[in-house]
UniProtKB/Swiss-Prot annotation:
The keyword Cytoplasm applies. It holds the Pfam family PGI. It is an enzyme of class 5 (isomerase). One of its GO terms (molecular function) is carbohydrate derivative binding. This is Glucose-6-phosphate isomerase. Its EC number is 5.3.1.9. Disulfide bonds: none annotated. It is found in: Cytoplasm. SUPFAM superfamilies: SIS domain. InterPro entries: G6P_Isomerase, G6P_Isomerase_C, Phosphoglucose_isomerase_CS, SIS_dom_sf, SIS_PGI_1, SIS_PGI_2.
Length: 547
């Protein structure tokens, strides 16, 4: 990957000039009644992406695609898919795409076809899932497994939890639990719900040394042994998603039940790997494979579709337009599907940990905005919480609205009511309500304007708020896999254009280092003076109150 400062490209400077045209969404629709047809794309006739409600025209898109060309997005894409070590700061390839490479075409890293190992781990996962789900695998008292607890953090938790929640309509009889926080409350509340005789723990840590994960795993291990009274029970109730065979065996786990993944799998892209074992146990391996199929189909689309029809590329470029030229600082992801209630949180990590960087690939501080803040909640809950600010606040917040045409729970008229809100919100954000319309509504209600002249400004909506509408035929393992991969590739494209390394996360390290230094200070009764006055004061008050 080349070091290309995007602000030095012809396209970037042309976009700066183009911004002065002050395009507005209502104006663009007035000029082109068939705008929807020209500014929407379809994937496999199962996903429709409508980006027409953005302040863009064909000239905007042409310049944005030229920016992608000047920043060599296509060659960077080939480099990633081909196993080149594009994660330069860690000297690693980036191959989450290989994990779902259903075509099974060879992918080489250091002259070795990684697909052989990928397929071997998938086969091992399949056999394990079949034994647990069928009841062949039993706990230390001979009872079948009923509950599965995934112990991980970050990508080892967010992805599996999001997907198992999103695909709950496909779940089997196993009850899934997820523990991530080192706060003892999280593991304690989970253990209170389950039976040690029928619980399986998945410990997800590549190194098997992650502080939060191993703290929780050791507490779970002790909880099991308090009942079982026999160390051999650990091997029947714990498996490892790890590469550290020595530590796994030391813990008491049979290394035959250690599921490997590789250093070219980033945590926030790892749900496709052995880290997804909890997903496969929850929905069955056949459905897990369909999840991989959907992601692979989107991978092929991203790799092969021309720029004009390329969904991840288009979404990435529109995001850059809103972020770097129109001044948006955040993006909201708003799924109108309760099963997707963790989707925004998942891509909060996916985007902000990937592109929240201020150092370019040239090692210098950038002088432009990089990744946006990502946030969101399911509709319609958000409408009664933060939509007020999106509609009438002073910040520009582009939104992605996601909804299924078909619901898994067709109860009464719930779904039409939900979708009516989905459609209404993007229309309201785009077109707003003028002063004249507000006044006319008062007149039609029999109220004179003299009575309400002071109220009218508060009921005006300026509109011109950008949104993407992503309509899915139905949330299935296939369409969910495609949606996740779509956002992954959007993030990748933006990172290439931002000229940053999207696949490291050095920003998480400093806090961990300082926490390791502070921990011993919390275990004695001495007054602490080794930090700044604020940190000293907080630690000393904690020590006083914990007595």
């Amino acid at each position: 990957m080349q070091n290309i400062n995007p602000t030095q490209t012809f396209a970037w400077n042309a976009l700066e000039q183009h911004k002065a045209e002050n395009l507005t969404i209502p104006q663009l629709f007035n000029e082109d009644p068939k705008r929807f047809d020209k500014y929407s794309l379809r994937f496999e006739d199962q996903i429709l992406v409508d980006f027409s409600k953005n302040a863009i025209n064909q000239h905007t898109l042409a310049l944005l695609r030229q920016l992608a060309d000047e920043c060599q997005v296509k060659s960077a894409t080939y480099a990633m898919f081909n196993g080149e070590k594009i994660n330069r700061t860690e000297n690693r390839a980036v191959l989450h795409t290989a994990l779902r490479n259903r075509s099974n075409t060879p992918v080489e890293v250091d002259g070795k076809n990684v697909m052989l190992e990928v397929n071997a781990v998938l086969a091992k996962m399949k056999g394990f899932c079949e034994r647990v789900i069928s009841g062949v695998s039993k706990g230390y008292t001979g009872k079948a497994i009923t509950d599965v607890v995934n112990i991980g953090i970050g990508g080892s938790d967010l992805g599996p939890y999001m997907v198992t929640e999103a695909l709950r309509p496909y779940k089997n009889h196993l009850t899934m639990h997820f523990v991530s926080n080192v706060d003892g409350t999280h593991i304690a509340e989970t253990l209170a719900k389950i039976n040690p005789e029928t619980t399986l723990f998945l410990v997800a840590s590549k190194t098997f040394t992650t502080q939060e994960t191993m703290t929780n795993a050791l507490s779970a291990r002790q909880w099991l042994l308090d009942t079982a009274k026999d160390e051999s029970a650990v091997a029947k109730h714990f498996v490892a998603l790890s590469t550290n065979a020595k530590e796994v065996a030391k813990f008491g786990i049979d290394t035959e039940n250690m599921f490997e993944f590789w250093d070219w799998v980033g945590g926030r892209y790892s749900l496709w790997s052995a880290i997804g074992l909890s997903i496969a146990l929850s929905i069955g391996f056949e459905h897990f494979e369909q999840l991989l199929d959907g992601a692979h189909a989107m991978d092929k689309h991203f790799l092969n579709a021309p720029a004009e029809q390329n969904i991840p590329l288009t979404l990435a470029l529109i995001g850059i337009w809103n972020n770097n030229f129109l001044g948006a600082e955040s993006e909201a992801i708003l799924p109108y599907d309760q099963y997707l209630h963790r989707f925004a949180a998942y891509f909060q990590q996916g985007n902000m940990e990937s592109n929240g960087k201020y150092v370019g690939r040239d090692g210098k501080f950038v002088n432009y905005q990089t990744g946006p803040i990502i946030w969101g909640e399911p509709g319609t809950n958000g409408q009664h919480a933060f939509y007020q600010l999106i509609h009438q606040g002073t910040k520009l917040i582009p939104c992605d609205f996601i909804a299924p045409a078909q619901t898994h729970n067709p109860i009464g008229d719930h779904h039409p009511k939900l979708l009516s809100n989905f459609f209404a919100q993007t229309e309201a954000l785009a077109f707003g309500k003028s002063k004249e319309v507000v006044e006319q509504e008062f007149l039609q209600a029999g109220t004179s304007l003299e009575e309400v002249v002071e109220i009218v400004p508060f009921k005006v909506f300026t509109g011109n708020k950008p949104t993407n509408s992503i309509l899915v035929q139905k949330i299935t393992p296939f369409t969910l896999g495609a949606l996740i991969a779509m956002y992954e590739h959007k993030i990748f494209v933006q990172g290439v254009i931002f000229n940053i390394y999207s696949f490291d996360q050095w920003g998480v390290e400093l806090g961990k280092q300082l926490a390791n230094r502070i921990l011993p200070e919390l275990e004695n009764n001495e007054t602490i003076t080794s930090h700044d006055s604020s940190t000293n004061g907080l630690i000393n008050q904690f020590k006083l109150w914990k007595q």
